[in-house]
Design a protein with these regions (language model features):
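Subset of outer-membrane beta-barrel
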Residues: 9-178
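Sec/Tat signal peptide C-region and signal peptidase I cleavage site
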Residues: 2-8
Length: 178
């Protein structure tokens, strides 16, 4: 038996093929040779409830023959609950292209990111703030002044590979390796 600490989940894009660098770092430069690709994505989850989850991302990648693969950049922001919890990350990606034969190739990719997490305590509600009869009358006992809880900036790494031909592709990605 083993255990591993789990962290909050990443945003999920329903049209994941429209954001290939977010899906797998091996997709960096997976375009016709020399052809650049730019992508902009916007997601507003559950807009009818008021405090939505809004995610935006922008990416650029291109295959470069001189380095034997592709490079890319990905910037993403995820804002939850009217900005109470905000996650931003910026990534640089590289993928190596290996042509097995004329009909099949492999790409191995690596992503290095800096991630920023912030939490706005002023707009959060905790159970210890609510009186059963009078509503919100108490201050919270939660630790709001701890900078380790409010803001974090840290590096993060991901890796992946894809194999592809004219008719199919397959792949695997491992994110948040730190």
């Amino acid at each position: 038996m083993f255990e591993k600490q789990a962290n909050a989940q990443d945003p999920a894009f329903s049209q994941f093929y429209a954001n290939p660098l977010y899906l797998n770092p091996a997709f960096a430069g997976a375009t016709p040779k020399g052809c650049p690709r730019a992508s902009l994505n916007y997601r507003d989850q559950w807009p009818g409830i008021g405090r939505t989850y809004v995610t935006t991302s922008a990416s650029y990648d291109q295959h470069i023959d001189a380095i034997g693969g592709g490079v890319g950049i990905l910037v993403q922001n995820d804002r939850s609950g009217n900005g109470n919890y905000n996650t931003t990350h910026a990534s640089l990606l590289y993928s190596y292209h290996l042509e097995i034969n004329r009909k099949f190739a492999l790409k191995a990719g690596f992503e290095a990111s800096f991630r920023s997490l912030s939490l706005d305590w002023n707009n959060l509600t905790f159970g210890d703030m609510i009186h059963p009869q009078y509503g919100f009358i108490y201050p919270t006992q939660e630790n709001q002044n701890n900078p380790d809880v409010q803001n974090k900036i840290f590096p993060d790494f991901s890796t992946g590979f894809i194999g592809y031909s004219e008719n199919f592709f397959f792949g695997f990605a491992a994110h948040h390796l730190t």
